[in-house]
């Protein structure tokens, strides 16, 4: 009789333990689900805020770019425009990270070519413009 009693109590303890483990697993999975849902909500809120900030910066940068385009640009303005364009590319790369490296490489190559052309242009046009300016200055002096 003692043996039957020990087996019955052991069985009850084992089943109670199994139920408690099962309940713990369920509560953990429910907690995980709740945590995951709250993380999703936080991420979506963060994504919305980031999207709003990106939209604001894109609009502000486009406004600055249009302001610079409507007036005569100096070398400093040109450099500032390059920086603004780089920032715009960076903001766009946040939307499409896989294409960013391709776009960046393509932009760098085009920018490098433009810089080389500008340097050649300055070397050729600098002396020509100074000679033309000297000739025009001499003509104006003779006419005046």
Swiss-Prot record:
Propeptide: 19-43, 74-123
Family: Belongs to the bombinin family.
Protein name: Maximins 5/H4 type 3
Alphabetical list of InterPro entries matching this protein: Bombinin (IPR007962)
Function recorded in the entry: Maximin-5 shows antibacterial activity against both Gram-positive and Gram-negative bacteria. The only exception is the resistance of E.coli. Also shows antimicrobial activity against fungi C.albicans, A.flavus and P.uticale. It has little hemolytic activity. It does not possess a significant cytotoxicity against tumor cell lines. It does not possess a significant anti-HIV activity.
Compartments (UniProt record): Secreted
Keyword Amino-acid biosynthesis: no
Gene Ontology CC, one term: extracellular region
Record bears the keyword Acetylation: no
Any matching Pfam family: Bombinin
Secretion signal span: 1-18
Tissue: Expressed by the skin glands.
UniProt KW keywords: Amidation, Amphibian defense peptide, Antibiotic, Antimicrobial, Cleavage on pair of basic residues, Cytolysis, Fungicide, Hemolysis, Secreted, Signal
Organism: Bombina maxima
Gene Ontology BP term (one): defense response to fungus
Sites of Leucine amide modification: 143
Primary localisation category: secreted
């Amino acid at each position: 009789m003692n043996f039957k009693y020990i087996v019955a109590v052991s069985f009850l303890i084992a089943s109670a333990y199994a139920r408690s483990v099962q309940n713990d697993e369920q509560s953990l999975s429910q907690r995980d689900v709740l945590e995951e849902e709250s993380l999703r909500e936080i991420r979506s809120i963060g994504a919305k805020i980031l999207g709003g900030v990106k939209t604001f910066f894109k609009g502000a940068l486009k406004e600055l770019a249009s302001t610079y385009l409507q007036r005569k640009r100096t070398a400093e303005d040109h450099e500032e425009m390059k920086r603004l364009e780089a920032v715009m590319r960076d903001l766009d790369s946040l939307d499409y990270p896989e294409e960013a490296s391709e776009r960046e490489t393509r932009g760098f190559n085009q920018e490098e070519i433009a810089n080389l052309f500008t340097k050649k242009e300055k070397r050729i046009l600098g002396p020509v413009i100074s000679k033309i300016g000297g000739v025009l200055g001499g003509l104006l002096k003779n006419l005046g």
